[in-house]
Amino acid sequence: MSATAAQTAVLSGPKSVVERGSEDYPERLLRCGSPPDRLYVIGNVEVLRMPSLSVVGARKATPYGRGCARRFSTLAAARGLAIVSGGARGCDSEAHRAAIAEGAATVAFLGGGCDRIYPAENAALFQSIIDGGGAVVSERDWTFPPVPYAFRARNRLIASLSAATLIVEAGLPSGTFSTADEALAAGSEVLAVPGSITSASSRGANRLISQGAEPIIDDDTFLDALFSIYGCLRQETYPGKGAGNGALASSQAADPLVAALRAEPLGMEKLRDIAQECAPAGEDPWVWLMLRLAKLEQEGEVQRYPDGRFGPVVRPLV
């Protein structure tokens, strides 16, 4: 990698230097092995303290890897998570673009300084990240060159900032393994998308799964993982889905049961208490509750989560 391949560019946006110990410094970065003394940021510093998912993968990505990066980043972004990645070619770029398309914030951690754009062809992408309420970040001074060792070092920041890291595609050998190791060291979850056993581009991800990474085999397993790690994420209305198509819409906001389920997932004990207060006179509260939950489930507006609680449906993309 040649430092001359980096573009000395000017990204437009507010510049900040976030010192360790300041209120803007993300607490999660203190979990990494060597927290940086300061972060150089162009864009919105507040995004660094948002709930986020880190998405990483191969630079020389296959169509499968690019598609997985887009799909799962879109699903996560639609549920209120910022998307964190490394701004590299391939899977990283797809993850950033998916977040931007969803109207969500995204963070790009660069290996070099924020005024030494690498790769140069991603200058427009980095500007879009900033314009969309995200941030371009480095632990290096503004004009520090993008030398190889700095990229491996920045992987610990990508892995530590989020509660989970998703590996969408990785071969062997792969720098993605250092990101996975850093995530585990920081107490973050590691998720991985399996690929064909005959694909060299998936050998790394498959190896991570064999070593204990959580396999993401479809939308449902991904959404279950998000719920397990982040709790109840917000319900979204996708294009083509009318805002009034659900019993959890505003037309029923006055219903105490619906309002309670919108606020947080609830177990049967709390639901039974609500039923005692809300069931019409003369009706058995337990029977009334079971009928209401069954109706809401049938209409696709409430679901039972893996831990047995009920809450709003987390909708997959269609």
What is each model feature region?
Residues A5-V318:
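Glycine-biased, small-residue-rich flexible motifs in mid-sequence functional cores and linkers
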